[in-house]
Structure formats: C-alpha cells, structure tokens
Amino acid sequence: MALQDGTLGEPVSIDRLSDLMLRLQGKGAHNINLVTPTPHRDAVLAALKQAKKDGLSIPILYNTGSYESVETIRSYEGLIDLYLPDLKYRDDRLAKRFSKAEGYFSVAIDAISEMIRQVGFMQLDESGLAVRGVRIRHLVLPGCVFDTRAILDAVAERFGTDCPLSLMSQYTPIPECKDPALSRRLTQREYDSAVEYCLSLGFTDVFTQGLDSVGTSYTPPFHDRIDL
C-alpha cells in the first residue's frame, strides 16, 4: 500500500497482506500496527480475518488521527485489541486551519467513544506491554496550550480522569509548513503548563515527554525497506 502521494510503498494483495502479518508475528513482533488504515478498510478487514484464521494471535493496534466515522470504527469490532487515537483539536477553527478537517472534534470524540466501548481503557501485561484498550494521544502545539486545556476538559467530561492519555511534546517544524504559527517548536514553559493543567484535573494515567523528543528522528523512515 503506497503513501498518499503514491511515491512510496507497493501494492499488495489481501493474501500478501495477511501473510506479512503472520511473518511479522513469526519474527517476534509484539503487535501489528495499522497506521491510518481507513482508505484500505475493506482490504485490511479481509486480511485481518484471514490472518487470524491462519494463526495470528498477537495484538492488533489501530493507529489513527480519529477523523473517522463511528461506522468505520465499528466495522473493526472484535478484530482490534488496541486503539491509539489522536485527539488533535478542540477548536474547529484550528482543525480547519492546520488540517483542513471540518468539524474535527465532534467526529473524533465520537469515534474515540466507540473505541472505548469496544475495548475499554488501556491494559498492560506483566512485562509492561500494552495488550488491550485505548490510550488517547494529544500533541501540544506551539501557541495552542489553550486548546490543549480544552481537549483535557472535554476528555475528563466525556470519559473521566482515569482515561489513559499521552501528552506529546514532539512537534517538529518542517520547511513544507507555511503557516507561521507552526514555524517554531514548543517551549518548555508551554509544555509544562499543559502537563500541570492535566494533573490538576486529576488524570491518573498520563505519559509525558521531554523536549528532547523533538526532531526528525521521530519521523518514520518511509524509504527504508524491510524484507519479510
């Protein structure tokens, strides 16, 4: 499956995708990570069902920006063990400006609600590996701590403060981004303010990051090829 611009990746059949999942399991993978699989939903569903029939038993992780319909998420029920949804924006003006995502928040919060209905909050095994459930991720953006606070308020109201969170600080400006608001990194003061507000609300399970997480090392090496 190629990336959106069509310059990377390769087409694979349903049988091949199913086989790749089984090969990853055979090589010791902890889970199968489906990153934004929505454009290929029908093929992914078919491949998952085939792989599970043929012995796939490691957790299946669904990694998403959450701009998805409840119907789409519901179609994966019983197949997905772990959901890692982003909750990017509370203010729809930011969603439209930065991501061209009209009505982002209402769509995303309903999709996440369906994920939680299916698998609950994230659970870890005895070795500390996630095996089931949901952890909501939020990337704190420069100049947008006010929106982070609104996101945290909304999560606390909708899901309670036991909802697992990941507050990320890794925003990295790239030359292709022309919006001046996103031309700089997050400051320590901004991130600390976001974390302090999160804790003041009483959230009990929060992953945080140091600002040393900023940089291109967090950008996946899309050009690397792994032979399976």
Features from the language model and the residues they span:
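Non-cysteine beta-strand/loop elements that form the S-adenosyl-L-methionine
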Residues: 77-92, 162-170
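Alpha-helix N-cap and loop-to-helix initiation/capping positions
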Residues: 12, 39, 99-107, 143, ...
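Auxiliary Fe-S-binding modules of radical SAM enzymes
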Residues: 116, 120-228
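Conserved Radical SAM active-site core
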Residues: 1-82, 91-93
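Anionic-ligand binding region
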Residues: 96-127
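Alpha-helix-loop-beta-strand connector modules within alpha/beta enzyme cores
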Residues: 47-61, 107-118, 188-197
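A cross-family glycoside hydrolase active-site/sugar-binding cleft signature
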Residues: 33-37, 61-65, 86, 135-139, ...
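Conserved radical SAM core fold
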Residues: 3-4, 41, 66-69, 87-105, ...
